[in-house]
């Protein structure tokens, strides 16, 4: 299941660059927002502060897109479960629709997307698909449909399979950002699966699935850069740090947006030519990175930052209107 957006011509490998015409790309990202569409109160430097909120994140994204219209915006999953917004997860698909309103182009599944069981996830995806809104691509490359089909789909598995078809869930997509052809793929990690007791789906090994998907991209697409949305995470114990293992085992990945462990990486973790980046949780920070292609075709980091989403950032006026409308359905107002 592959979608190609704004591309012409497919061939070969990730390309080496002409040294006289090096390409650049800007990426902004969130993950583990857990239904925190609105700002929320917390203690910062021993003071009660209102932080986060999609309206402020939208302001920063819009400001960046004024400077760089081809900025890529992505999410790493666990966009649901954590505030009262989750009560309209099925009926309004508020979280994924609001990601679309931010300009987010792709996301992946986190373990909390399964909290309302197969029926709930299926209903949410159907609601989003039928809403008429622009919603992110949903990317997961390691669902083991073959094994489930051989065993005979359960009712829940069939519900999700049908909803995936309606929504258009894929292993990867190609997107065009200026002169840069971006391959985006998503993967669901081992610990994420262990944290999803209501998940009825079966998954293949994340590393092996990413290897296979990257090989397919390199064979069939004319990609300049490969970005993985991984709901796997990192750990201080490198032997258990899933996204570090992924970076080492699949060195053709250029960037891993690392979600699940709510890690806040002030600097990227670097293995070879692969950058692992994370921006904490609940939309407290908006991650951004600027990359420049090197002569060998790989990418160097020009800038990386996590911007705190605090009250000094003006709220985009249209965004609260959107999620207030969606939340009104909690009470039938």
PLM-predicted stretches and their roles:
Residues 17-311:
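Acidic, metal/ion-coordinating pockets
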Residues 7-19:
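Sec-dependent signal peptide cleavage junction
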Residues 324-331:
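Conserved small/polar residues in nucleotide/adenosyl-binding loops
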Residues 1-6:
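Bacterial N-terminal signal peptides
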Residues 312-317:
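Short, surface-exposed beta-strand/loop "edge" segments at domain boundaries and coil↔beta transitions
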């Amino acid at each position: 299941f592959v979608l190609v957006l704004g591309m012409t011509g497919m061939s070969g490998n990730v390309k080496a660059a002409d040294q006289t015409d090096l390409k650049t790309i800007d990426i902004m990202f969130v993950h583990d927002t857990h239904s925190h569409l609105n700002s929320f109160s917390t203690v910062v430097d021993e003071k009660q502060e209102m932080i986060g909120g999609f309206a402020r994140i939208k302001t920063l994204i819009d400001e960046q897109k004024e400077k760089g219209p081809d900025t890529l915006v992505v999410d790493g999953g666990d966009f649901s479960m954590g505030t009262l917004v989750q009560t309209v997860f099925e009926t309004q698909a508020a979280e994924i629709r609001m990601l679309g309103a931010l300009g987010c182009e792709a996301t992946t599944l986190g373990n909390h997307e399964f909290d309302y069981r197969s029926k709930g996830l299926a209903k949410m995806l159907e609601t989003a698909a039928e809403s008429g809104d622009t919603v992110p691509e949903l990317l997961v490359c390691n669902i083991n449909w073959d094994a489930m089909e051989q065993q005979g789909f359960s009712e829940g598995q069939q519900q999700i399979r049908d909803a995936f078809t309606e929504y258009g869930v894929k292993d990867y997509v190609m997107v065009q950002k200026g002169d840069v052809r971006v391959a985006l793929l998503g993967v669901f990690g081992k610990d994420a699966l262990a944290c999803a007791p209501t998940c009825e789906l079966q998954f293949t090994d994340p590393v092996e699935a990413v290897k296979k998907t990257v090989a397919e991209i390199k064979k069939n697409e004319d990609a300049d850069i490969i970005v993985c949305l991984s709901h796997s995470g990192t750990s201080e114990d490198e032997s258990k740090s899933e996204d570090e293992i992924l970076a080492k085992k699949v060195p053709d990945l250029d960037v891993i947006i690392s979600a699940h462990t709510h890690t806040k990486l002030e600097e990227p973790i670097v293995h070879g030519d692969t950058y692992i980046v994370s921006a904490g949780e609940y939309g407290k920070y908006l991650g951004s990175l600027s990359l420049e292609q090197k002569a060998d075709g790989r990418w160097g980091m020009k800038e990386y930052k996590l911007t705190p989403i605090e009250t000094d950032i003006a709220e985009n006026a249209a965004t609260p209107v959107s999620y207030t409308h969606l939340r009104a359905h909690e009470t039938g107002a």
